[in-house]
């Protein structure tokens, strides 16, 4: 309301910066929740969180992570055409994203059985070398 009612106020620039920061934090929180849903195996819920970031928070740094979440979730749900579309958009707009290899191939960490586990973890029934769930939030915290 401050910006709408008093656009020429001395506090307006600070209010704009705070609103941008809050929008970035909300988008980052959506990515964090999507990571939680991946760990729980709720791939459709993670997909919806990623899609929300891409559709409604387009000017935030978390859009790349939202696209990666969409690609991963579509792969896990067996929707390969939609996964390819999401990964193509990610590759076109964010070629340096950590989940993309040098040839713009998507580095999928999750499988249909859950996390990819090392042979040590499998041999020790999960006692040693536990899998680290991937985090699609690669942006540094500000």
Language model feature labels by segment:
Residues 2-17, 21-25, 55-63, 77-80, ...:
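Short solvent-exposed coil/turn linkers within tandem alpha-helical repeat scaffolds
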Residues 24, 28, 44-47, 65:
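Amphipathic alpha-helical repeat elements characteristic of tetratricopeptide repeat
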Residues 4, 8, 38-50:
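Helix-turn-helix repeat elements of alpha-solenoid scaffolds
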Residues 29, 33-42, 84-142:
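Terminal, low-structured helical/coil segments at or just beyond the last alpha-helical repeat
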